[in-house]
Amino acid sequence: MKKQVHVVGAIIENDKQEIYCAQRSPQMSLPNFWEFPGGKIEKDETPQQALKREILEEFTCEIAVGEKVEDTTYDYGTFIVRLETYMAKIVNGKPVALEHSNTKWVKRTSLNELDFAPADIPAVEKLLK
């Protein structure tokens, strides 16, 4: 049976309608793909708690989590990912990537110019509507 991973992603939007996107480093699984920052949900954590913890750990800032945007399951062949994405705002600090190779603020209308990981694409498509 394939490994199943339940993860969350933050669609962090600023006042200019730009969304914070992170590029996975060459050492990570799914190297060099872009994604909405986030990570795995730990045991006894809600998706919202996991998102706040992951963003603080990996990007050194605090967020407020808003409404759910998408809930996608994607089979990568060797493992299956369930990704829940939520709107979010930064409430304290500025994001600094500790694990990703690159980050950028991208206008909603330009999201499709980045090479997103397949599990993130349904959320990207919803944001482009």
Label each PLM-derived region with a short phrase.
Residues 1-19, 40:
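Conserved N-terminal beta-strand and adjoining loop/helix that marks the start
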